[in-house]
Amino acid sequence: MAEEDAEKAFFQAQTMNAESVDYKAVEEHGADSSDSDDYDPSKTLQDQYSSSMTDLKQSENVSSSASPEPNPTEQNSVQPDHDPSQPDGASYPSQTPPRDESRTSTMVPTSGTSVQPKTRTIGGFVVEDEDEDDAGDADYEPPAVLGVEDMNTVATNVPQQSVSGNENEASSTPDVSLDDAAQQSASLNNVSHNSYSPAPAVAPKSDVAVAAGQSLYNSHALQSGNVQDSATATPTPDSPSTSKGRLPHDRVGILEDRIQEDPRGDIPAWLELINEHRSRNRFDSARDVFERFLKVFPFAAEQWVAYAKMESELNDLYRLEQIFNRTLLTIPDVQLWSVYLDYVRRRNPLTTDTTGQARRIISSAYELAFQHIGVDKDSGSIWSDYVQFIKSGPGNVGGSGWQDQQKMDLLRKAYQKAICVPTQAVNTLWKEYDQFEMGLNKLTGRKFLQEQSPAYMTARSSYTELQNITRDLIRTTLPRLPPVPGSDGDIEFTQQVDIWKRWIKWEKGDPLVLKEEDPAAFKGRVVYVYKQALMALRFLPEMWFDAAEFCFLNDLESEGNEFLKQGMEANPESCLLAFKRADRLEITSESEQDPIKRGAKVREPYDKLLDALYDLIAKARTREAQDVARLEETFAKMNADNPPAKTDDDDDDQSESKARESVKNAQIDAVRKAHAIQIGILSKTISFAWIALMRAMRRIQGKGKPGETPGSRQVFADARKRGRITSDVYIASALIEYHCYKDPAATKIFERGAKLFPDDENFALEYLKHLIDINDIINARAVFEMTVRKLASNPDNVHKTKPIFAFLHEYESRYGDLVQVINLENRMRELFPEDPTLEQFAHRYSAPTFDPTAVRPIISPSQMRPKAVFPTSEQPMSRHGTPTPRYPGSVTDSPKRPLEDFDDDYNRPRKFVRAESPLKTSQRRQLDQQKRSQLSNVQTGSQFRSQGSPAPLPRDIVHLLSIIPPASAYTAGRFSPEKLVDLIRRIEMPSSISQIPLPQSARGLGTTQTPMQPFSGKASPSLSVRAVY
């Protein structure tokens, strides 16, 4: 059957090719008019091409209207949406048709039947005809590149290869679904590459720009731009859309299915599909994929650059100019502007410029570029190119002619602008500027350099700081959806977001000192960084919100509204952006007298948000069905491959089948529960979006009147009609009716909600609060009993009754009867036995900020006695800032080697007793003099010290003295030693203390120690000495 279908498709393609190609008409278009050499590409930025863009959009809609079908071999015809009678040249009514389009205008089939791909069969499978793909490779000539050489060499006598080009386009291989043939036939009116030489067999490596930021994606997802890499199959997700109806070698169909399933998340599929079409020289299909990709990612500058380079290589200058018109003024990207500047210099060669018109055009293009990307930290190369461009102009620097003076002024102006911008070339440009000024006149040069030096120093230091901030930044324009916390790539994504935020914060800190001198430049730099960040963080609503908020706070109303508009287009499901946009519209439309018009304007963001959220729920339902179908298919295949072993015992066979069935059901239940959680979150989000819209309409239109103004009641009715709402919508509507209008409809709404949400404890709690607010205690108790009994009847819902019990218990404790309170506590104790009784009892008398039952008043000062701190041997306390006490050594030191000074006795090295070394006469005299001075100091320092050498203090006392903080640490009252001594005198000590022997460690080294005597009211000398110390 497959062979018959393939043969039928082959003969149909042959018939269509023979009928649709008019060779005579192709030859007659060989002498078409050439392009004008006086064309000014810089002026195209101001043109809108309204009519041509409309026709282009129509052709794009035709090419994108076809959707992939499950079976690529079943299709009879595709009817294009455009009128076949309309000539192709009408696509650009305001412009002269380019040569390539005029040559292909006669090739459009007159019938709506699509050209079937030329195929053949091998072994019963449909395969591609490699001979057709390789046709014309020997005659291939590389297209012109963007540059300054050979800029007027756009050939006017290009060989007519449109027929072969169409054959190459039509003879598509079977790995392209038949929708691609429909797209090709529908887009033939825009064919422009066929008039060029035979298309290359291998696309250049710069086909699709692959940013450094692609490491954020899966490792298997993004390959290099080389076509050889694109020939390798990329692992695709196992889904029914790709596993059914697609042959394994149908790469285009598989990639289309991946894009259709996840257009915003599967960027690698987009890039591979573009490479696939370009590698097969299907440039119309590649254009179609580019356009679809850029509708989803309109600020992906890397792909705009790849798109522009493709058109440049094909010499399709009109399409290239259209790309520049669509991107340059809205996408501030250095690489994109570099491509534009190269194109301008290509179309305006300086070698043949006798009038100076080309130089003026190029100069105006540079000025326009600096207005949009001149502040970029990577724009140093463009500044350097501009300086070199000025140097190449007529005139000599330092001459006396008017051209010389003009060149000197232009160079000085360019240098002074460039050295103020923190770029990678700021140091090089400053050195060149220094040589330039000093080469003209040293006196005036020093003056100019001195004036510009502060700006240069600021720019240089700022660039260093900026490089430190952005060292790990991956500056890509291919945005990624934020990973869910805990999933793959969330840490890397968070790091990138933090770097962007630090960059923005750095710009807001005004490091270039522009806020006071040039506030417009300061705001422009911050907005520029926001735009750069939003290229990479397109799907992060918080960043759009911050950018818009900055604009609103700095009188940039139009920029802020544009940020919100673009943010909502990128994130239609973001409540943050929709609410902010609605608030701005509500504030700015206060002058509108008609509440209906004002309400319609404010409601627009809410409607878009709700549509996106409902669409997400539909997709979640579809994904759930696909996951369940995949599980069932997997288990069915497993049962078919490994059926249960047949045994004599039927019970064993049934038990094995039941086990497999139970495993399948468990997995299906897990999948459904996971999707139910996601759908529940979406339903909650939808409900709060309706609530926000309801409150906004209440502010603008009130509660509404039937037939006149919708108001909040109409929003409530719309929410109920559309469904997927939670009890929060009923609660909000009822409370609006009560608090704003005191309308009895609030109670009716609660009654209606109680029937719809009988198991919702939050709704029951709000219902109780409302009934108590209106002083309807009888109905409140009735609702309480009804709700509690219904929830308690199900053991799984018992925990839901706790907040309801707690609320009524609090109310009864304050305003009810004690018997009711005790009964409630008994019921709570039965339902929640794990809760302590003390907590329930204390709840009666406590408030959210104070619990009197937990207070312990201070009755005696003994309750506030501080704890004694005892240092442990494992971790001695720190003594930083405390002076270490020094005591006169009792052992004679040798002047030849002083005794080691230890702060304490811990870990003191063990010493061996050695004989004293003999001292010389001078050393002995010095030692005797030192002893006499120490003795006199001790005797004069304290009148309480006894004669003779004092005994060393015990180790514990030394340690205690060492850990006492210094006097400066005491900020309260000072320590009074007199009062301490007086306290010690009044202490009554037992008379038997003299019987206690002294510990061995407390005994002195001498024999003059006397036993301790009973306290007689007089302080002993040793005690007095220690107290004074």
Curated annotation (Swiss-Prot):
Residues 21-32, 894-908 have a biased composition (Basic and acidic residues). GO terms for molecular function: mRNA binding. It comes from the Eukaryota. Its main location: nucleus. SUPFAM superfamilies: TPR-like. Residues 229-243 have a biased composition (Low complexity). Residues 1-177, 225-251, 634-664, 853-951, 996-1023 are annotated as: Disordered. HAT repeats lie at residues 281-313, 315-346, 357-392, 406-439, 469-509, 521-553. Residues 43-79, 104-119, 153-175, 932-949, 1006-1023 have a biased composition (Polar residues). Disulfide bonds: none annotated. GO terms for cellular component: cytoplasm; nucleus. The keyword Cytoplasm applies. Residues 127-140 have a biased composition (Acidic residues). Component of the cleavage factor IA (CFIA) complex, which is involved in the endonucleolytic cleavage during polyadenylation-dependent pre-mRNA 3'-end formation. This is mRNA 3'-end-processing protein rna14.
